[in-house]
């Protein structure tokens, strides 16, 4: 189907449940698209209002279909003060389970000290965080749709680097951060990253001297990588207990559980990735 028809299903809970049933999915985490609905272009008041509307609708879906949906929420992180207010409302009042954030806001990446109070609050509330970039606006990446095929994975690597090198993962060790698309390129260049810290020990001044690879298992990763070999590397490096199933619904894998099976997963590992780990993260 055309993109418009596919995206239409994303905004119709009954249609999404039909697709879930067809794919053997019991529970889906409702999420606003950070690509389509990224709001850091807006002024702070408009940004907050757009986020509140998205979060209210997510809560409505969960209230109407509590056995089929868990809710995520978006935040106006270009303004950390407003973001903290909406975080408390979304987590405590609406009961939503996952903060759905981008890799950066107006050029400031999520590990920046500006956002450390946000991460402190996230750890205190105990909610999970899913990081999915809004997209790369650099003109070069618009050619050949590279903003999506290459750019997203670059952004995910930059987000992980920001969180590690700026000390977030050291200061707040109980964070539950899920990286979209298997963390992009970051998990696959650890040798080069660690070597650089050996040559430049000043680069790990915020990590207690720990190398980047030390923090790989501090994150969770979704399985939406489209390549069995990439998934195999993630399994070897972080283990099945740090992976959760991703689908890129409604435009990604039509059968995400079947894809995992096709990668050779079975038994306990399949059970963890297909649902067990996510249930633990969400507390359901």
Locations of the language-model features?
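Mid-to-C-terminal alpha-helical segments outside catalytic/metal-binding sites
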Residues: 1-27, 56-64, 85-89, 175, ...
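Short glycine-enriched loops at secondary-structure junctions
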Residues: 33, 77, 133-137, 249-250
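Short glycine-enriched, charge-decorated loop/helix-capping segments at active-site entrances
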Residues: 43-48, 147-148, 259-263
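Short acidic/His/Gly/Ser-rich catalytic and metal-binding motifs that mark active-site loops
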Residues: 37-40, 83, 137-143, 253-254
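Mid-domain alpha/beta scaffold segments of enzyme catalytic cores
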Residues: 1-103, 113-114
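Amphipathic, non-transmembrane alpha-helical scaffold segments
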Residues: 47, 51, 55, 157-161, ...
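Catalytic pocket-lining loop regions of alpha/beta-barrel enzymes
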Residues: 89-244
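Conserved beta-strand edge residues that scaffold enzyme active sites
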Residues: 34-35, 105, 136, 274
């Amino acid at each position: 189907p055309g993109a418009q028809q596919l995206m239409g299903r994303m905004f119709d809970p009954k249609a999404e449940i039909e697709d879930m049933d067809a794919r053997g999915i019991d529970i889906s985490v409702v999420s606003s698209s950070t690509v389509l609905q990224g709001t850091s272009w807006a002024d702070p008041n408009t940004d907050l209002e757009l986020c509140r509307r998205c979060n209210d609708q997510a809560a409505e879906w969960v209230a109407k279909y509590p056995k089929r949906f868990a809710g995520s929420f978006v935040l106006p992180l270009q303004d950390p003060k407003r973001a903290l207010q909406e975080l408390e409302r979304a987590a405590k009042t609406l009961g939503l389970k996952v903060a759905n954030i981008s890799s950066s806001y107006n050029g400031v990446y999520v590990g920046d000290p500006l956002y450390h109070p946000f991460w402190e609050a996230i750890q205190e509330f105990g909610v999970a965080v899913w990081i999915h970039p809004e997209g790369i606006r650099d003109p070069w990446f618009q050619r050949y749709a590279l903003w999506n095929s290459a750019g997203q994975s670059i952004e995910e690597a930059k987000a992980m680097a920001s969180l590690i090198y700026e000390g977030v993962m050291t200061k707040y060790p109980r964070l539950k951060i899920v990286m979209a698309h298997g963390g992009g390129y970051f998990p696959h260049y650890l040798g080069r990253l660690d070597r650089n810290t050996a040559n430049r020990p000043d680069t790990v001044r915020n990590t207690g001297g720990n190398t980047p690879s030390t923090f790989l298992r501090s994150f969770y990763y979704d399985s939406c990588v489209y390549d069995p070999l990439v998934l195999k590397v993630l399994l070897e490096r972080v283990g099945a207990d740090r992976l959760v199933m991703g689908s890129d619904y409604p435009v990604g894998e039509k059968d995400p559980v079947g894809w995992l099976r096709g990668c050779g997963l079975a038994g306990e590992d399949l059970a963890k990735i297909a649902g067990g780990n996510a249930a633990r993260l969400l507390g359901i």
